[in-house]
Amino acid sequence: ASVVADAYIKGLRGYDIETLWEALKHGANAHLRGTASGRLGYESYNQLGYVANNIGIGQNVARTLEYAYNDWAIYTLGKKLGKPESEIDIYKKHALNYKNVYHPERKLMVGKDNKGVFNPNFDAVDWSGEFCEGNSWHWSFCVFHDPQGLINLMGGKKEFNAMMDSVFVIPG
């Protein structure tokens, strides 16, 4: 979604944007079994606002953060295409789903089960399980579409900067 939105917004043309638009919307609400297409865990994501960590789907926090970013991209593209708010508002709402895996005491992204309970065995430097190619310290800053929202969530600029500085000294 982000590649298509970025290309269109930058003025790159030569493709059927309406077909791509429909494909982006479909991909945000489907997972073709046995393929890498669509969103694994989309049912949980759409219902709960995050991919739950107890439904047999790994990398659930990473998926939640990536899906939120892609929803922002879909929303942004929809606005550029002049799509009605009734069609794109759900993507604007889902773009904020990153907040649903934010643990306010830890100031990090942490997995939750389908009852809304944060992972009691959370390990901030674990590269497996709830994350992919990184750990909670890395992924907690993957809110590229709403940096001010993340800064506010972490308690303001001072707290955000302290957390960001910690990424460079935490082992793992």
Predicted regions: what is each one?
Residues 4-6, 13:
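Buried, small/hydrophobic-residue-enriched core segments of structured protein domains
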Residues 11-96, 100-172:
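Active-site core of glycosidic bond-cleaving carbohydrate-active enzymes
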